[in-house]
């Protein structure tokens, strides 16, 4: 279980195969309302910040001062004119390259904060190192989001794909989704989904592959791999135990570690071992801890046990106070999806002046925690973009050697999309005309009666 220590599971009866008679519930318990004071104990506060900072008491940050360099030299540029530089390709091919630390030294503190805090449908441009503005959209069966002007092809639901049990077909679907994304000017997808069909009533079942962890993980890994072949990265979602859509916000999800690992984490583990570089955390809690702020989940299991290399983004976070950007950062999260109505911010962040003055004070560990995790998150976001582009270049090299067709991404250029905007306006005018015509026709019919 998530809680540890004496009395952690007091009063909780877990269903077990060894004693169905004694543990299977006969009568549903009455609903209980959590007291506000109890709920507040599970919000990220000064005490939890101090506990996270204590992990850094015996370590030092690379520097308490993030260099204020506005532009790196040409060698340190990661991208140029819509394509990767040699350095960008090399860093995208090697997460542990020592030059990462030098690249991070060319990113200002404000650029890091902006990148990490504002992850809704995009990641920000960092012109000093040649990182362009990137664009991300949904979804599991179609490239596009509710607020996008252009959509890709609508494919059958992932459940149908899973029923084929054809990993090669899933790979081709991923390649097609990745290429469509590139054609529409999209860099990454909030897809696919690796949650399970726990109940037929699940509100997102149409986005999920299966009730079986092996099927789910295998198909998800292949879709992600296919998208990477096309140079498009994926944020596999929702990590973890997001098996209902109604009332999932801040939902306290209780389960044994056995069921967590064998069922609900297994699909994600398969996908990570298959090369997935992006994950989206979930709204719910695992035990009492928000999944997007769980160090046990995002660091201990995901990175230290599974060896995950990449970035974790929160789900849409513009309407929930429990989804703390500070908690996510220190737990191992990398991107905060702040949304339309909330401007992402850190309540326990540091300015450059505060970092400079923290050395030798009782705030030194907290400053180290903040800057170390901020640099890590920046690296991870950059890596996800670079790794997908490098994977596409590798795919095309292998295709050329094998005499097969490459997957050429259209070069993405800056500036407005005049063609797309014009088509969208034409659609809007046409739709308005149809509605107006229908209104007039209905009115004439009524007047003729």
Give each language-model segment a name:
Residues 1-449:
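Glycoside hydrolase catalytic-domain context in secreted enzymes
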């Amino acid at each position: 279980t998530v809680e540890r220590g004496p009395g952690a599971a007091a009063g909780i009866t877990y269903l077990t195969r060894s004693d169905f008679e004694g543990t299977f519930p006969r009568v549903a318990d009455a609903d209980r309302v959590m007291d506000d004071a109890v709920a507040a104990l599970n919000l990220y506060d000064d005490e939890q910040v101090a506990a996270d900072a204590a992990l850094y008491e015996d370590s030092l940050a690379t520097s308490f001062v993030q260099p204020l360099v506005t532009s790196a030299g040409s060698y340190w540029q990661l991208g140029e004119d819509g394509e990767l530089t040699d350095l960008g390709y090399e860093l995208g091919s090697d997460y542990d390259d020592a030059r990462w630390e030098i690249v991070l030294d060319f990113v200002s503190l404000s650029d890091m904060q902006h990148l990490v805090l504002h992850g809704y449908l995009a990641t920000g441009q960092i012109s000093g190192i040649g990182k362009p503005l990137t664009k991300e959209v949904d979804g599991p069966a179609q490239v596009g989001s509710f607020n996008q002007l252009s959509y890709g092809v609508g494919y059958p639901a992932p459940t149908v794909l899973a029923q084929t049990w054809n990993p090669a077909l899933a790979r081709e679907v991923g390649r097609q989704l990745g290429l469509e994304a590139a054609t529409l000017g999209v860099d990454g997808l909030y897809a696919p989904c690796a949650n399970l069909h726990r109940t037929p009533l699940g509100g997102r079942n149409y986005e999920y592959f299966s009730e079986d962890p092996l099927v789910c993980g295998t198909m998800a890994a292949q879709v992600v791999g296919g998208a990477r072949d096309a140079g498009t990265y994926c944020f596999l979602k929702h990590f973890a135990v997001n098996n209902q859509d109604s009332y999932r916000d801040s939902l306290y999800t209780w389960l044994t570690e056995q069921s967590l690992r064998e069922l609900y984490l297994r699909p994600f583990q398969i996908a990570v071992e298959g090369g997935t570089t992006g994950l989206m955390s979930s709204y719910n809690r695992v035990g009492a801890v928000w999944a997007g702020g769980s160090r046990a989940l995002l660091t201990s299991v995901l990175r230290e046990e599974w060896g995950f290399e990449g970035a974790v983004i929160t789900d849409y976070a513009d309407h929930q106070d429990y989804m703390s950007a500070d908690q996510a950062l220190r737990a191992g999260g990398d991107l905060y999806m702040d949304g339309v109505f909330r401007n992402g911010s850190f309540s326990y962040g540091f300015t450059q002046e505060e970092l400079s003055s923290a050395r030798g004070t009782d705030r030194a560990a907290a400053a180290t925690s903040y800057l170390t995790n901020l640099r890590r998150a920046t690296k991870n976001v950059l890596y996800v973009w670079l790794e997908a582009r490098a994977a596409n270049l590798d795919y095309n090299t292998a295709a050329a050697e094998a005499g097969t067709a490459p997957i050429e991404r259209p070069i993405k250029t800056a500036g407005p999309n005049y063609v797309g905007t014009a088509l969208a306006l034409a659609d809007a005018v046409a739709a308005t005309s149809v509605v107006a015509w229908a209104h007039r026709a209905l009115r004439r019919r009524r007047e003729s009666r």
